[in-house]
Amino acid sequence: MLTKAEASVTEPVSVSETSVSLSGVTRAYRTKRGQTVAVEGLDLRVAEGEVLGVVGPSGCGKSTLLELLAGLQEPDHGTVEVVGAATAEERRKVCSYMPQRDLLLPWRDALGNAALALESQGLARREARERAAPLFERFGLADFERSRPRALSGGMRQRVAFMRTLLPGRPVLALDEPFASLDAITRTDMQQWLADALAAEPRTVVLVTHDVEEALFLSDRVAVLSARPGRVLAELEVPLPRPRDRRAAVRDLDLARLRERALEVLGS
């Protein structure tokens, strides 16, 4: 079991530095079988610049949580605030959402897909492409700007999708299982890539994943949700300094203990 000192690398989230806040949030849906409550009484805080991982069973409301943050939904009860933005319309201006699928447009090249985020903000296509272009070299995609999505590997497509998420410059990113569709080797490579990308472009991040090891490697803190309706069962602080190395993390005993703890909570 981690000592208090080992588990306290990340400072507690104070009100003054909170970037994301959910208080008593409940969200339900009407289905043919009646009402389904996705999350109920959900409370979470995320500090400015913190990466929060969220894990939990399938159907526990993880994607609903991200859609609430990104302003794609409103809660039935409770409050959701992102950098002070309390309404869905306001949250859409400060939170960028990356869904599970890359959703690249097949008729646009990679640069055009990344630049689409800027075009949607009113920039002319040429200017948007000029602003997006420098990221391709930084993110290991130099010489692939003109490639269509069908010519890109799964990892490359996810990098383009991440650039599209990053380019609007919003302070908060909501990432919904960005590597779920990738094979194991590519997924491991992309975990290291994302860790490096977030080190170079720090943002407040809420990352949903089914992979406990992925959550621990990428996050400063991990929230474990219950089965539906989703509630926070535990919050685990990750005592791993940045920058992070995926190969070293595999051998880290503190992370191994945290993984066991997370799995215990999920199995309870």
Question: What are these model-predicted stretches?
Answer:
Residues 115, 119, 126-144, 196:
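Conserved ABC ATPase "signature" region
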Residues 70:
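Helix-to-loop junction immediately C-terminal to a conserved catalytic motif
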Residues 7, 20, 78-90, 131:
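Conserved ABC transporter NBD signature motif
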Residues 148-152, 156:
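Conserved ABC ATPase signature
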Residues 55-57:
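The feature captures the beta-strand-to-loop junction immediately N-terminal to the Walker
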Residues 15-22, 28-41:
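A short, flexible loop at the N-terminus of ABC-type nucleotide-binding domains that lies
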Residues 167-171:
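A short, proline-enriched helix->beta-strand linker immediately N-terminal to the Walker B motif
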